[in-house]
Amino acid sequence: MALAPPGDAEAGTSHFSIVDARGDIVAMTTTIESAFGSRIMVRGFLLNNQLTDFDFAPGAANSVAAGKRPRSSMSPTLVFQGEQVQMALGSPGGSMIINYVAKALVGVLDWGLDVQAAIELPNFGSRNGPTLIEQASRYEALSAALVERGHQVDRIPLTSGLHGIERVPGGWRGGADPRREGAVRGE
């Protein structure tokens, strides 16, 4: 393992999936929202600015109200078969996280892909607006057909940052999205 090359640092959300030698496993997504969060530090920890996730239009489902928490798309996921964990998965990516995680789950559970192949599938989805398709992916070819059917389609970079681990005979196999920082490491 080596240091990351210099470049623009990602701000906001991080995710990791880890399994230890005993089989204890975690999928953890954490965020302080934007770089340095609220810019307020308490006892050495930066506080997040999660309140910016509220809809400030009165009466909306996610509008500000006393005792309410803002909607979050964080989706650290553990998949079980009976009592045994089969997979840990998650991603940064704001409101697109649910789309990213669902894509990888369908790839592994429904299509029989390994976790790396499922993570590498092109990204797509919606945030209650236009259909979003990953720019420069094989799904761009679908854009014209969707537009003909009345969809508004935007082709944009969608760099998920998915990280996952799946149980395989004799151990574990990891996957990390090559579109963003992250790596698989094991012994």
Q: What feature does the model see in each segment?
A:
Residues E10-A11, R138-E187:
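Cofactor-centric catalytic regions
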Residues M1-A2:
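Amphipathic, membrane-active segments
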Residues P6-I156:
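Proteins synthesized as precursors that undergo proteolytic processing into mature forms
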